[in-house]
């Protein structure tokens, strides 16, 4: 249940922040948070990261539904007693669902977190994207420790 609450928290935070951006900012408007480093920039993306597969909504619908079903299956089947695995899956579920809601409702994803590292403008992203990335990193860490435990046995 905890893992689904994590996913729900991510979905609510993601959708609330996207609603604030859409409601209070013009497309392309940028607000500095830390000048030359972090901005809130109103952006839309019809594809994946870096605009890959722009406009291929049916592809994203099918893949995302399959991923969500897979994550729910793994939570139900394997997450009991595996806190790190469950948290990682909850984060990925929330992230996948957050961006799916955008694609289904708007046919695009609202992005707004704009990071500049030296002179490189990292692709603008959102809370769902961040949640997916952190979830994948935690899953990788879980897999490293889990495979180490299996080798010891």
Swiss-Prot record:
Phylogenetic lineage: Bacteria, Bacillati, Bacillota, Bacilli, Bacillales
Subcellular location: Cell membrane
Active-site feature positions: 111, 129
UniProt similarity note: Belongs to the peptidase A8 family.
HAMAP family linked to this entry: LspA (MF_00161)
Superkingdom to which the source organism belongs: Bacteria
Entry function: This protein specifically catalyzes the removal of signal peptides from prolipoproteins.
GO cellular component: plasma membrane
Species of the source: Bacillus velezensis (strain DSM 23117 / BGSC 10A6 / LMG 26770 / FZB42)
Name used for this protein in its record: Lipoprotein signal peptidase
């Amino acid at each position: 249940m905890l893992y689904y609450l994590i996913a729900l928290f991510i979905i609510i935070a993601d959708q609330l922040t996207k609603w604030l951006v859409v409601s209070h900012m013009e497309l392309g408007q940028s607000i500095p948070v830390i000048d030359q480093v972090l901005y809130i920039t109103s952006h839309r993306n019809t594809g994946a990261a870096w605009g890959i597969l722009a406009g291929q909504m049916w592809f994203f619908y099918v893949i995302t539904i399959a991923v969500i079903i897979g994550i729910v299956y793994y939570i139900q089947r394997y997450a009991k007693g595996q806190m790190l695995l469950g948290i990682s899956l909850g984060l990925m579920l929330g992230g996948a669902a957050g961006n799916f809601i955008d694609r289904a409702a708007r046919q695009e994803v609202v992005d707004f977190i704009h990071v500049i590292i030296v002179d490189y403008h990292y692709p603008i992203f959102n809370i769902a994207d961040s949640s997916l990335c952190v979830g994948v990193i935690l899953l990788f860490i879980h897999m490293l420790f889990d495979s180490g435990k299996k080798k010891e046995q």
